[in-house]
Amino acid sequence: MVYSYTEKKRIRKDFGKRDQVLDTPYLLSIQLDSFKQFIEADPEGEYGLEAAFRSVFPITSYSGSAELQYVSYRLGEPVFDVKECQIRGVTYSAPLRVKLRMVLYDREAAAGTVKDIKEQEVYMGEIPLMTENGTFVINGTERVIVSQLHRSPGVFFDHDKGKTHSSGKVLYNARVIPYRGSWLDFEFDAKDNLFVRIDRRRKLPASIILRALDFSSEEILANFFETIGFEVKDGKLMMDLVPERLRGETATFDIVANGAVVVETGRRVTARHIRQLEKDAVTQIEVPVEYVVGKVAAKNYTHPQTGEMVVTANQALSLEAVANLSQAGFKHFEVLFTNELDHGAYMSETLRIDSSSSRLEALVEIYRMMRPGEPPTREAAEQLFENLFFSSERYDLSTVGRMKFNRRLSREDETGAGTLTKDDIVEVMKRLIDIRNGNDEVDDIDHLGNRRIRSVGEMAENQFRVGLVRVERAVKERLSLGDLDTLMPQDLINAKPISAAVKEFFGSSQLSQFMDQNNPLSEVTHKRRISALGPGGLTRERAGFEVRDVHPTHYGRLCPIETPEGPNIGLINSLSVYSRTNEYGFLETPYRKVIDGVITDEVDYLSAIEEGKYVIAQANAATTEDGRLKDELIPCRHKGESTFMNADQIQYMDVSPQQIVSVAAALIPFLEHDDANRALMGSNMQRQAVPTLRADKPLVGTGMERAVAVDSGVTVVAKRGGMIDYVDASRIVIKVNEDELLPGEAGIDIYSLTKYTRSNQNTCINQRPCVMLGEPVMAGDVVADGPSTDLGELALGQNLRVAFMPWNGYNFEDSILVNERVVQEDRLTTIHIQELACISRDTKLGPEEITADIPNVGEAALSKLDESGIVYVGAEVKGGDILVGKVTPKGETQLTPEEKLLRAIFGEKASDVKDSSLRVPNGVYGTVVDVQVFTRDGVEKDKRAKEIEEMQLKEAKKDLTEEFKILEDGIFGRSRNLLLAAGYSEDRLNKLDRTKWFELAIEDEAKQIELEQIAEQHIELKADFDKKFENKRRKIIQGDDLAPGVLKIVKVYLAVKRRIQPGDKMAGRHGNKGVISKICPVEDMPHDEYGRPVDIVLNPLGVPSRMNIGQILEVHLGLAAKGIGEKIDRMIKEQRALHEMRDFLQQVYDLGEKDTKQVDIAELSDDDVRTLVGNLRKGLPVATPVFDGAKEHEIKALLKLADLPESGQISLFDGRTGNVFERKVTVGYMYMLKLNHLVDDKMHARSTGSYSLVTQQPLGGKAQFGGQRFGEMEVWALEAYGAAYTLQEMLTVKSDDVNGRTKMYKNIVDGDHRMEPGMPESFNVLLKEIRSLGINIELDEE
């Protein structure tokens, strides 16, 4: 097996039994692919910007004399790169330029004669670009656009579950949902009449829409009903017989066939009777005339002579009507075939309640419903109806919608127009009637075949189209104004509405979210999130249980575990590991093909719709050596149900056992032993883990850690293989392998590392190289670790030695007892970086000034500021310290005589400005790590800004010079090799200046050309360097683009080191969370017989009721893994021979069942083995994949190999008394995370502060510097104790008795501790509210 550079250094023992048929796909592809589709030119014009332009252009003037056509578009280069955008607080975007063609037609000449054509490139605003990690930088902050799960366009049939009508009758409905345009609903009422609604407005009889489509009553009936023919023969009334139609009816007369009575009067017609009639081949039977009474005529019958209407279509026949038909000479007439069972008379009944009789009346009725109060004209009514469903500008089903529509109506062809047709509407009504008749089923709305994913690209395209449509209206008006000869396309188009629409979407849409950047996992998960909320989606209040529930089609598509707790449960989901979207936006999951019981390696992606057709076995089905399915009956899934089938019936099989879960859930070892509720908490809490100071890989992992670390983009991955040429803390240089070089390039890759930057959640982002000079790396290898990664693996927490035992009540109710040593070793210390900004504005009274000259502030407070009034980098500051001195001019006030005197003596300055400096918020302490000053163009830069500018220039020059030197050395190295090969000596070359080498001649012509090419490269490199430096210099020197009225912004970055302390929240990966109750001295902790104390003590009662047994297995396996590491450590200390080490390692990696993944130590070189052994001293990392993990006997075997008790329990001693505890205790290693719920951020106490305006009560919460709520139950407590005075002051002077509290304050100042309670303000509010209801309340004093 080939290992990557970092894998080889620390090989993880894998307990998985199944081979990986499919590698874990790139985890961010849903974001990147979608946006790529939006941005890249699409010649077909089906999606992206191209589609948006083509749908709006060409724009024709109202008169038709001019037309604006779209030719093509191009995106320019972004001005600033991603990092610069983040620092400057601007959007990372590229300008969009569109080539438009304006065509003017000659009005006088024949139609279509072109008078003039003008072409021009027009600027259409900025389009935000996606970074390579799938995020957007909007106004300097990283944001993620979450994908949306919405109802797919198409046609859906449903019923109301009997909730609408009091009788509990089930009412069916059909709904045609377009991608954009009006919704069309058909629904039955309790009397079985069919109605139509447009856009959920007032309902109309469904026949109205058919009349508006120009159907007559006859045509409507012919479309929806079969007919029965009656014929008058020799004075008898004969009926055409279709025997099947009589099923279930009660004969009202004798049914006679070939002279024999088959069914007697009053008997029910059964299947036997029908068979008899079919056998006798009877085509007509005689019926009494009364049988026809009440039947409904299928056609209009007009008198051949007089032309008057004898019977109209849909008229119920009477004896008289039948007689009239005979008289008029109609020997044969047809009636509608209906029955109660499966041929209801719905459409016929609906026609009866329909008041309209012509197309015009129907159109007017629809117009009145859509535009109540407007007088309808024929043109307006026709135009409105045409625009509703038949105009491609107003209505679009989209390709997805058309595909779903045609599939649901069982059509062969899946393509068609985006608008509706007559047939579409009629067929929907027919299908709805079929469902009402019991011949078809309703749809399942929550089936993933009926819900699709709308990703970034598609949503951005829709927003862009909205902007274009706004522009279209303006352009049409301008084209009609005349004088077009002088206008150019640029004069017609205003880019504002377009950029406003795009900006609004990226900046403030519900689905554009501030990226969760706690750790790499939270980034990846956020980008893979699927939300049912948002514009065009559901709302929290409306969503019921069904939508939130796990559906069988979620299998392998959406994770059944990872979803938030609380009001959003089930509405926000996460993509499963292997899931992807297909061209229509439906989720697909991969399956291996099974042919005649033999599993192949062929993988097919199936959507939820396709999956229903197949029989699918699970990934852990037993197989033979040659890949056949072993068992007689195999558990499998078919049509959303679990069943057992024979091997030859199985068509597909899961790709991997991890297929059903998301990335976060796949990181939980022994997930299969955890209760789902706890697993949900576990996967959610991993996203809140704060990156620790030194990342520590999990001893017990799942093998998924590497994929997350690499795909998240926090690590640095080598793009091409080569040798490490240079490495330091801030850059890595790789000399690329010869075979990966592009022709004519220097062959040097330079990777700059991110150092100590702030993340969205104020955690620290820092990259550290994990390679050594001169080592070879391959493409795709991790060369530098980021936050929460360790040797290219995700490392969210720390491996701590845990004991499950009670300890003096300090672990009551999930509290956690922690060893002091964990604090000393900085195991759970985290770094947080806060950004504080000071803005200097231009006020009415004059500009605010940033200065060190602040009125009424002592020297001590200014000691950390430089002469510009800005804090030094490296200063240690605490709450209340001034970071940036700033003074604001204040208005002239009336002065007292004393002040006038003081001003006369001491001059003007101090009085006309007030101190508005930026201070460190209360409770914050830390070190200033960076200061940035942004100055508006045209405002003179202060000394500090110039210093920073000089420093940046210096650094940029140094970086570029080093980069240039490295590349130049590469070029000279290649030319040197060429010249040495051509026979020049080392000495001669060394004597010459290196630039002169290019002037030497080589006899071999090909080599000479190569040398000349290298010389050209050198010249290009030099020019490139100068250009880059000039660009950099221009960017650094130019003024900043600040908001209107802002002169200067100073940003100060504080780094805070937070050690673990009581009150911090910690958690394992199994939903086992708790708060630290005490940091216990090392000597008091329970320890083993060798005197090694445990790091952390957990409560054993937290396990049984929560049913997350995975944590116990993790602890046992962790103990074994650590034991192996300690055994290796002992071998190193005993200086055992290398071959012994190899043998032991081989024994460890071979342990387990025969299917377990093998590692061949023999393949590794001696150096590799030494590195590996050195890294394994701290413990052997193991992987136990989800649903395919280590078995109990394997854990025991590993414990045995590590010379540890197989029970995983040891005797512990009490650190305080030295006595052994009565029972053995489960001790082992658990991976514990420190969550971003730190007590420092929550601690808060109010002294005096602001009050709410209406109730005059103190505000609540830390952000408002609020008080603690003294609630209902607290009042009861004081009442119960009879503490009347305490209660009185709580409800008055300490809360909202305005006069009382001011008096109280005054009294305390005077040293008089009395209180005079008055009327609480909230009581006055109550009085006012009662009065507002019209009830007068007066307070009478006794």
Swiss-Prot record:
It is an enzyme of class 2 (transferase). InterPro entries: DNA-dir_RNA_pol_bsu_ext_1_sf, DNA-dir_RNA_pol_bsu_external_1, DNA-dir_RNA_pol_su2, DNA-dir_RNAP_su2_dom, DNA-dir_RNAP_su2_hyb_sf, RNA_pol_bsu_bac, RNA_pol_bsu_CS, RNA_pol_bsu_protrusion. It comes from the Bacteria. This is DNA-directed RNA polymerase subunit beta. Keywords: DNA-directed RNA polymerase, Nucleotidyltransferase, Transcription, Transferase. GO terms for molecular function: DNA binding; DNA-directed RNA polymerase activity; ribonucleoside binding. Disulfide bonds: none annotated. GO terms for cellular component: DNA-directed RNA polymerase complex. Its EC number is 2.7.7.6. GO terms for biological process: DNA-templated transcription. DNA-dependent RNA polymerase catalyzes the transcription of DNA into RNA using the four ribonucleoside triphosphates as substrates. The RNAP catalytic core consists of 2 alpha, 1 beta, 1 beta' and 1 omega subunit. When a sigma factor is associated with the core the holoenzyme is formed, which can initiate transcription. PROSITE patterns: RNA_POL_BETA. It catalyses: RNA(n) + a ribonucleoside 5'-triphosphate = RNA(n+1) + diphosphate.
